[in-house]
């Protein structure tokens, strides 16, 4: 029994379930001399095959359990498969029995069938990956053919028309408000003119009453003048009668001339009295006329000053009313503009709040996807760690298996003439060193599509076989 050559092809580092296991870089140990090769342990990418006439059952059992733990159930694209392989054989049948070579051949056949099954499942996974990739390409191509740009133009035109209509409605409302304010202003002006007309009519009525009083006073004075004239005429008549009576009395007497002072002329005296009365009456008439004219002038001055003051006040009131009206019109226009701007602000806030809500939903969705990606990355890292530990354990068991095989080669030597077991105590330890380069690949997958792929080269590792 010669196990002088050991060749293995294995992935340098297990990969997460999203990639196919048992593929990647390979390492090969050719440190054992070529002259000692009789049986072989060979492998292809994704497989391990062992040929040996006899293997201890404990080693085979340990190797099968390690291989089963290193190849867990994996899933991809909705299909899953799980496999486990068990090796069992009696130690006496493998080491000391006559059918050790057949048992090892059976073991190799079962392992080959298992690896063939793994390869078929990997091929099935590749087909499913291709179908999924084609489906995503078709879906992506279908979505790209839809062009909504013309709808965006129509929406923009409709939004512009709505905005123009709103502005036109605001202008019409502003014109209506201005017309209402102008009508109210004209109504206020009419009411003010009405009040002014009533005030002027009242003033005219007052002046008419004063004129009537003045007319009555003038009539009274004229009546007094007429009375004075009548009294004067009566006095003149009485004087004439008295003069006639005196003259008649003097006509029947004897004319006696007395040397004395001349008597006063009565006619002249009466004439003087009449002139005095006439002057007094004329003076009273002039005084009455002067008083009347003075009172009329004062009254006219008071009326003119009052009318002027009233007119000035009314003019100021009208100017103030016009100013108030202009300010009210400007206030209404500003209020209408404020309402229109508030409406536009509310529409803008509502539109941008909806946009912000959509963006927040998108952010939450992306955060959820990112958390899922992180969880998936952590899960893949854990699976990677488990597979790497299984790989390390498998390599250790393979190294132990090789040492045991080489030890069994020295212990058990059979003679062609004497089919007995010869025990020979030899111990050979071969510890080749294999340097592997480790490369970590991180893929970011969103909706089944690879978004980004990063490779991180690691430090070289030394494996003692």
Swiss-Prot record:
Region Linker 1, annotated ranges: 136-154
Alphabetical keyword list: Coiled coil, Intermediate filament, Keratin
Region (Linker 12): 247-269
Region (Coil 2): 270-408
Function description: Type 1 keratin. May maintain oral mucosal cell homeostasis and tissue organization in response to mechanical stress.
Biased composition regions of type Polar residues, renumbered to the chain: 1-28
SMART domains noted in UniProt: Filament
Chain residue ranges for the region called Disordered: 1-47
Source organism (scientific name): Protopterus aethiopicus
Family membership: Belongs to the intermediate filament family.
Residue numbers spanned by region Coil 1B: 155-246
Tissue expression per record: Expressed in skin.
Protein's recorded name: Keratin, type I cytoskeletal 13
GO annotation, cellular component aspect: intermediate filament
